[in-house]
Amino acid sequence: MAKVKMKTNRSAAKRFKVTAKGKIKRWKSGGAHYNTKKSSKRKRHLRKHTYVKDNMLKHVKALLKEF
């Protein structure tokens, strides 16, 4: 019997990006609405990307088929 390929989770593929070095880049949450009460500094930092932490890396890679 042929081996079945895993499908990529499309919602995860739109939210995460694998860099050339193999790190997984993500964007910070909390900047879409209710921004009037947030400081300019906080909103500026929310615009920047960050990387997936080591303890979540295995789960995200499974969603992206990155084994």
Curated annotation (Swiss-Prot):
It comes from the Bacteria. One of its GO terms (biological process) is translation. Residues 22-45 are annotated as: Disordered. GO terms for cellular component: cytosolic large ribosomal subunit. InterPro entries: Ribosomal_bL35, Ribosomal_bL35-like, Ribosomal_bL35_CS, Ribosomal_bL35_sf. GO terms for molecular function: structural constituent of ribosome. Residues 35-45 have a biased composition (Basic residues). Keywords: Ribonucleoprotein, Ribosomal protein. Belongs to the bacterial ribosomal protein bL35 family. This is Large ribosomal subunit protein bL35. It comes from Aquifex aeolicus (strain VF5). The gene is rpmI.
